[in-house]
């Protein structure tokens, strides 16, 4: 869900409704458990929208994602996805709400959710019902990346900025893991319980290509990451053959 939020943020910037230099005051009540660092910081911090976008993508900061999701609005994120030709993308929950669904904890706050997530407690609720949860097809995810690389999803400068952020993603155990050293990849990973994914653009010697590898019903360990990395390598070898 963080890739669509990122694109929607820059679309709002293009439209003049959001400023990348705009500061968002962080409060402890805004914390979201899971990946990221904002939830460990003192309140009163005022990162810019660009700072939040960088944190959301590079270290998959959940709190940053929810702050941007609230700033742009869920309806706007989904409308942008329809406008760019990715109608399968649905984001009915913030990440906090998604975790509340997963753990059967409506209204629960940071501390309670963190403990339940650590224990993998809860039935999953609507979060595991495909028609009601966060979802997207690999085809539409690839379409987003293809249009970013073609500089057609936003204005060229915004596409450049989005791709620059995506190239800074820190998790490199999936699509980039087995590729030749120095291969540039602009990508975003996704992980929640038994779902592990990665999608992006690989800049191969003979041209760039979009790739989306999505898995579900899998274990939460690096063996799954290695399987995704092997798929990525197979695609790379076929592409560059």
Predicted regions and their residues:
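Membrane-targeting and insertion segments and their boundary/processing signals
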Residues: 23-30, 38-42, 51, 111-119, ...
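Generic signal for short, ordered secondary-structure residues
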Residues: 35, 47, 59-60, 120, ...
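Short, charged low-complexity intrinsically disordered segments located at boundaries
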Residues: 35-42, 82-88, 98-99, 107-115, ...
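Generic detector of short, locally flexible boundary/turn motifs and exposed helical patches
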Residues: 20-22, 30-34, 42-44, 54-55, ...
């Amino acid at each position: 869900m963080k890739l669509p939020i990122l694109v929607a943020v820059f679309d709002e910037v293009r439209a003049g409704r959001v400023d990348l230099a705009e500061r968002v005051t962080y409060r402890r009540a805004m914390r979201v458990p899971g990946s990221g660092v904002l939830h460990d910081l003192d309140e009163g911090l005022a990162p810019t929208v660009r700072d939040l976008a960088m944190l959301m993508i590079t270290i998959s900061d959940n709190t940053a994602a929810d702050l941007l999701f609230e700033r742009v609005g869920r309806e706007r994120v989904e409308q942008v996805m329809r406008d760019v030709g990715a109608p399968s993308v649905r984001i009915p929950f913030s990440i906090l709400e998604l975790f509340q669904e997963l753990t059967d904890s409506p209204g629960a706050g940071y501390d309670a959710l963190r403990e339940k997530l650590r224990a993998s407690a809860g039935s999953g609720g609507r979060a595991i019902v495909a028609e009601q949860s966060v979802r997207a097809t690999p085809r539409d995810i690839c379409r987003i990346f293809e249009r970013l690389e073609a500089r057609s999803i936003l204005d060229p400068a915004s596409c450049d900025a989005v791709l620059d952020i995506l190239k800074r993603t820190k998790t490199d155990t999936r699509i980039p893991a087995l590729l030749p050293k120095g291969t540039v990849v602009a990508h975003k990973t996704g992980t929640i319980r038994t779902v592990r994914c990665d999608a992006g653009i690989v800049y191969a010697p003979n041209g760039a290509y979009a790739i989306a590898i999505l898995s579900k019903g899998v274990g939460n360990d690096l063996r799954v990451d290695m399987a995704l990395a092997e798929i990525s390598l197979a695609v790379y070898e076929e592409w560059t053959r």
